[in-house]
């Protein structure tokens, strides 16, 4: 049976960046992989960022956004059926940052998918500098994704390092600085889990805290075998469109400096929420 890994994580946590590294490891190991991208918005930006991975060992597929839940579920299943005929060794699914993890497991139990696929690892990407102030809906998404994770991978630790030696030195310093922040994030996650009536408690052993530029074969092998943790929790009913929105800047000729200035003005403008 083909194993499917689910890579979850809140909006902007770093899922696509992680998938690039994970996919490269799998291809270097001789595996043929498929990557299924699903974006909440109508334009799949993440797929654009992965285009250069396409080749003999890697194919990209996408589920278009902007549809109702039932249509999305049907498209998800149809895409997995077609991918099941391509002879992949492993499939990576990157859902949107506001994905219901139960949908993944429910679909894999439907025919004919239950004869072709089995869940691999559920890997949840969490920003090591996660905001402390989050809405009820944001905390719910964070907790629901962490609840089923076989491994939680912290992102944005020791970024933009130049050499392996420098990476190792700065990684230690970065991890030392991040320990307090990560402890706070773990506490935040566990509080969010309690709020949705989930009995799971995330511990350090459930996490990978490391600069991604220094990830080893052993790290990736551990992630491949991380599996998942089936947990029960209380669902929060809310409409995605009423809580989260997508903004697009397509073919807009603007300098980096002007873009930064515009972004700062948006965040400082109370009318933007």
Positions of PLM-derived features:
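C-terminal accessory "lid"/substrate-recognition subdomains
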Residues: 148-273
